Amino acid sequence: MDNYIKTALRATGEAWTVFKTSASTGQNPKLAFQQLRDKYKGTDVEGYVTDYTKICEEELPRIKNAETYMAQAKDVGNKVFQVFKANAKKVFTETMTDDDWNRIIKMASDIGYSNWDSEVKEYAKRYSAQIVWELDRQYQRLHKIKEDWWKFV
């Protein structure tokens, strides 16, 4: 679990660097994002990296003021990743209840629908939703592994 979080954090940092550089220089990030997707292909964070880099690619054309956008987007990212980190342990170690999932969804929604500048609103909504999807993806993956393990006992 700790490895997963560290890898996801590292991948987020790498994608964020490409995103930030592209926003401030206007360079096309498609190749750099594809290289990141290739780098993490076959790992536990493959889906997360694929989803996050696509969000970043689709957000770039919306950016009008890179400095303002990136400052707020960084704040969004930090808050979203805290929700992810705080709940990943529960996903990896326990059975999630409906109340747990509802709490996670509310935390992510609160971030996604906070009072962000209009330019950053879409990024906040999409990234906060993506974190919920990623937690669910990992939960489903681990639950299936558990089910498969019991078949051999």
Feature-to-residue mapping (PLM):
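Composition-driven recognition of long, low-complexity, acid-poor segments enriched in small hydrophobic
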Residues: 4, 8-23, 29, 45-48, ...
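Acidic, low-complexity, intrinsically disordered interaction modules
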Residues: 29-34, 40-47, 61, 100-120
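Amphipathic, heptad-repeat alpha-helical segments
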Residues: 74-98
